[in-house]
A protein has these predicted regions:
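Catalytic-core signal marking the mid-to-C-terminal active-site face
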Residues: 429-550
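Phosphate-binding chemistry for phosphorylated carbohydrates and sugar-nucleotides
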Residues: 13-16, 21, 25-28, 109-124, ...
């Protein structure tokens, strides 16, 4: 990846989005339903786009919300809908648009008290707590967020009654219905004025913040953190959980300092990410410069992205941990210190996650549930406690309550961040030190992710590749043991290919938004071996694409 000369530096004023212009475009832009890039398109986590290019405008939100109402009726979902919103500039306008449609459809909506911002895990938690013990009148939710993505982006996610990201079958149905409304100039979309929607008998207020914060001791050993006097630094990155951290510190008596509670829809306080864009990614060393600069003031420092579903862990010993490194540490700690978890609860990981997780799980005697990229694949396992933990290589994870029951079925950056403080308290060492102990025993992985150009046709070929189209027998000097196009955990298509040898592997997947494919690679033999894997991976994929396309 080519690193921008601005990476890691404060965002210059000319880079900041013009918020009034952006919000105006949200209301005035008219997407062309005949142009694919301007249609509703649900990715791994909802619909995302930008008002300035007519891919996230009021019409999209009105159409999606009506499509969700249509889906609810068809499924008999008639409980309240928990509606959350993050701090992106387009999120509040989109939340208002959604409320106008929900009120017109008679949906009981739970807005946050005092118009507080709402983290994704707080919405998932609220859905699950409401639905506990119920078989009828089930709740679901919407989170208005583009997650960690740039300030000009808007996003819209739907969480069904299980509390997690909607399955592909659901998002396809909602997407198709929404695009139907767009193509008919919103004919069939019901709507009332915002003032009427706010006054509607179906619009209610819910205390997401305290309901979530008061329950955190059920998933994290807060007493251990308090007793050890762990000094915790937090950077909310101007996100939806900005006011949650002070409440956590007060509730549990923690030595916790929020380095900044600033909220700015242009995110002008951020340092620039690797590619020259502003992105609130807590796993990026370029975006995390503000917290890295003060890490030595704390025993552990943590951050979350804009909707607080992703985490970043900064240690005094090792700086910012790579997501997979922290996941390995978290898994080891949780399965060693959660005596009430089911004995058969497994470890959920994606095909792009480190094989170190497999080695940790094997040492713990726990099965690994390996799935395609996307947190939705962990929902059922977390909901029914057949998984103790589910984590993605992109710094998203959730895990069970201490009693072995479901906590959230969506990613929870707050809980994952607080777990780092628990680990530090219980072990007397920070997660960076714990990671070195793990790799000393199980081997140290070296990882990289690269991008290679691909046409739309080649991307389609890659997503439909079969194992017998990979003809290579060796990878970086080792015999290829497995060629996967379906995930071993659930037999779902991975939308690409994964090639595995004894001490290394790579996975290749097409990008959903750009003309390229991504290669994830890992070696347990060192950087030279890793470079060989990356070099050979591109050749193996190119050869397979030529074979398939001929």
């Amino acid at each position: 990846m080519k690193i921008s000369p601005l990476a890691g530096k404060p965002a210059p004023p000319e880079m900041l989005v013009n918020v009034p212009r952006l919000v105006s475009a949200y209301y005035t832009g008219v997407p062309d339903s005949g142009i694919a890039a301007q249609q509703v398109a649900f990715g791994t986590s909802g619909h995302r786009g930008c008002a300035l290019v007519n891919s996230f405008n009021e019409r999209h939100v009105l159409a999606i919300t009506q499509a969700i109402c249509h889906y609810r009726v068809g499924q008999g979902i008639d409980g309240p809908l928990f509606l959350g919103v993050d701090t992106h500039a387009l999120s509040a306008p989109a939340c208002s648009s959604a409320l106008e449609v929900l009120a017109a459809n008679g949906v009981h909506v739970m807005l946050a008290e005092h118009d507080e911002y709402t983290p994704t895990p707080a919405v998932s938690h609220a859905i699950l707590v409401y639905n506990r013990g119920r078989t009828t009148g089930l709740a679901d939710g919407i989170v208005v967020t583009p997650s960690h993505n740039p300030p000009e982006d808007g996003g819209f996610k739907y969480n069904p009654p299980h509390g997690g990201p909607a399955e592909t079958a659901i998002t396809r149905a909602i997407q198709a219905q929404a695009n139907h409304y767009l193509s008919r100039d919103l004919h069939g979309v019901a709507r009332v004025p915002l003032a009427q929607a706010l006054r509607a008998a179906t619009t209610h207020r819910h205390d997401y913040l305290h309901t979530y914060v008061d329950d955190l001791s059920e998933v994290i050993d807060m007493a251990a953190i308090r007793a050890a006097g762990v000094r915790v630094g937090v950077d909310p990155l101007g996100g939806a959980g900005v006011h949650y951290w002070a409440a956590i510190a007060e509730k549990y008596g923690l030595d916790l300092t929020v380095v900044s509670e600033a909220i700015d829809p242009a995110f002008g306080f951020m340092t620039v990410d690797w590619d020259g864009r502003i992105r609130m990614d807590p796993s990026s060393p370029y975006a995390m410069q503000r917290l890295l600069a003060v890490k030595d003031r704390f025993d552990i420092a943590v951050a979350c992205d804009t909707d607080h579903d992703r985490h970043g862990i900064v240690t005094r010993s090792s700086g910012l941990l790579r997501p997979d490194h922290y996941l390995a540490v978290a898994i080891q700690h949780l399965f060693q210190h959660r005596a009430n978890w089911p004995a058969d609860a497994g470890v959920g990981k994606t095909v792009a996650s480190s094989a170190l997780i497999d080695r940790v799980a094997a040492r713990l005697g726990r099965r690994v549930f390996e799935v395609p990229v996307g947190f939705k694949w962990f929902v059922d396992g977390l909901f029914h406690s057949s998984l103790g933990f589910g984590g993605e290589e992109s710094a998203g994870a959730s895990f069970l309550r201490r009693d072995g029951t479901v906590w959230t079925t969506d990613k929870d950056g707050i809980a994952a961040a607080l777990l780092a403080a628990e680990i530090t308290a219980v072990a007397g060492r920070d997660p960076g030190e714990m990671y070195r102990e793990i790799t000393h025993a199980l081997g140290e992985p070296f990882a990289d992710r690269v991008e290679a150009p691909a046409t739309a046709a080649q991307k389609q070929l890659l997503s439909a590749l079969s194992g017998d189209q990979v003809h290579a027998k060796q990878l970086a000097g080792e015999t290829i043991e497995h060629v996967l196009t379906r995930a071993p955990g659930n037999d779902a298509a991975i939308g690409g290919v994964k090639v595995i040898a004894k001490n290394g592997w790579f996975a290749a997947r097409p990008s959903g938004t750009e003309d390229l494919y991504k290669i994830y690679a890992e070696s347990f033999l060192g950087q030279d071996h890793l470079r060989r894997i990356v070099d050979e991976a591109q050749g193996i994929v190119d050869d397979a694409l030529q074979t398939q396309g001929s």
